[in-house]
Each structure stands twice: as C-alpha cells, then as structure tokens.
Amino acid sequence: IFNIFQILKVDENEGICYSRHISKLDVVYQILSQQENPQEIISFNKIVKKMYMDMNIVPEKIQPGDTITSFNAEEYPTISDFIRYVKKDIEEIKQQKPESKAEEQLLINEIERLDNILRIFESVRDDYGKFLDGHTSINNIMDIQGIVFNIKNISLLPSHISNTILFNTLSICWDNCTRNGLIMKKLYEEGKISINDVTHFLVEFDEFHKIMNAKFPVALQLFTDMQREMRKVFGGLVLATQSISECIPEASSEKSVQQIKDLFSFSNYKFIGIQDESLVPKLKTAFGNSLTEAEYKRIPRLQQGNFILSIQGDKNIEFKVYVSDYEINLFRGGA
C-alpha cells in the first residue's frame, strides 16, 4: 500500500513538496470521482489542509525550517482517518448559525460538496481498502534503492481504482527520479563528481500491454512525460511486452493510438523480437519510419533469441541474445 495522504520529500523546499503533493491529490480525486468539478476540488483541498493542520503535520503557512515530509509513515492520516475528519467537519458546519439566506445557501452548498467527497472515499474504503486505505508499507520509501510494485491484477479492477493505483505508483517513481536526478545533475555540472559516479535511476515495467490502452489514459500520459523527461535527470524507462497487438487493440480511439505512437517515438532504443506476420501493420503504426520495409518483413521470420534493435538517429542492428543454462534456470516466466 502507498498512502495517498503521505507527503513525500520531492524537493529540498518543503513548500514545494506540499504544492506537488496537493497537485497529485487533485488528480487522484478527479480519477476517483470520475468527473472534473472545480468547486469540489477546492472543498477537497480545503478539508485536506485543515486535517493536516489539526494533526500538526502542516502549519497554516509553511516557513523555511518547517518539516512536513519527515514524519514516520504511521503518522500521516489514511483514507479512514480522512473519512472521520470529513464527517466531523460536516457536523461542525451544521452547528453554525448563518446570519443571512445567502450565508445559509453557501453552507448548504459546502455540505453537499463534502457529502459527495465523503461518499467517494467511503466507497473506496469499503470496496478497495486493501489497495488504498492504510499507511505506506515501506518507511522512508524515497530512500530505498530498489522497490518492486506488484500490479499483476490491476487490470481486473474498475478503471477509477486501477488508474489511481497506477498514478500513485508512477508518481512515486517520477518524483524519486527527479529528486535524485537534480542532485546528481548539480554535482556533475559543478564538476564535483564524474559521470561514472552519477547515481542513475531506472524504472522497468514488465507486461506493459496490460495498461497500454485507452482504459489508462492518466498512466499513458505519465509514461510519455517520463520517457521524454527522465533522460534529463539521469533516468531511464524500460517497457516490455511480448505482443504489439495488445498495445494497440481493435477499436482503439485515435487519441489513444496517438499517445502510444508518441510514447514509442520518445524511446531511443527499441528491441523487436518475432511477431506474427498479421501484426506487421500494427508495428508500422507504432514504429513508423524507424524501421525499413525490409526490416518489417524480416520480423515474422526472426528466430528464437534474435532481435532487431532500432536506434533513434542511427542505423538498426539485428543481433542474437545468448543465454547461459544458469540464466535459463533463473528464469521463472514460463516453460
């Protein structure tokens, strides 16, 4: 579990950390509510800030020296805590005595918005709490060198839940890459470390076809942004799938196909193994002119272990991967 209400250290400036955190919560709320309601988002941000202040996590105005990201994972509120706080706030509003009809209507509108927020998070807690309601499983998650996220069954969940989980997961990766990369970039550009001493950041995403479709527009956009920007901060993204057909399923919208094409276009290195001859048109849709007509015809005839490496801005190479018996024995992906 990653707690959506935990504030991560993505910058040395705690104020920036909070702004980034609230910005991500805005996206999470829009995904969970399955609509864009600016007034509800304002009410959501307001109640979240009040909760943090009452818990002495965030001051009313963040000043230099304040620390809002250094609490233990268990000290940040969870979805269940947030639900209790919203209920409390609703009751407090109901106790207020408006001095005019206009003020009364404002309070009624606020209660309606908070009721909507409450229903959304109660549904998440009751039906999908094991995925989203709880403290972050790993303390100091931004300081761990290697993390594996198991999202094996994510495609079986409703889209608003799976998109939320994916957004949280990718945001952690992207924030961690940026935080580490900016430190490394500064040290390298100031001549304090050599390129060999730079700590790089790598995100590997296996079974990528499970989310590379229109059901996960938020994830697709994030992947595209990461693929375009990570190289600037010593980061890289590896995406692996065994079938191009599942990346571009039938009846895909023009927008989702364009997103996938954009994602591939930002990939400097593309390793292509054998694909069925019937899939060549989809390969052409995805890779365009990065392969020649002869190479497209060659793909269905590649032997086991043979790949075509397409290098952006350079020539393509066909090569064979040699695997030792020891490495085959380590592999548990299938017989």
Residues covered by each model-derived region:
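Short, solvent-exposed amphipathic alpha-helical segments in soluble enzyme
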Residues: T164-N168, F287-G288, Y326
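C-terminal alpha-helical "lid" subdomain
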Residues: Y322-A335
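Conserved ATP-driven motor cores of ASCE-family P-loop NTPases powering translocation/secretion/packaging/pilus
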Residues: N3-Q35, V218-Y322
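Short helix/loop capping segments that flank catalytic or ligand/cofactor-binding pockets
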Residues: L157-S159, N213, P281, E318-K320, ...
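P-loop NTPase motor domains
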Residues: F2-G235, F307-I311
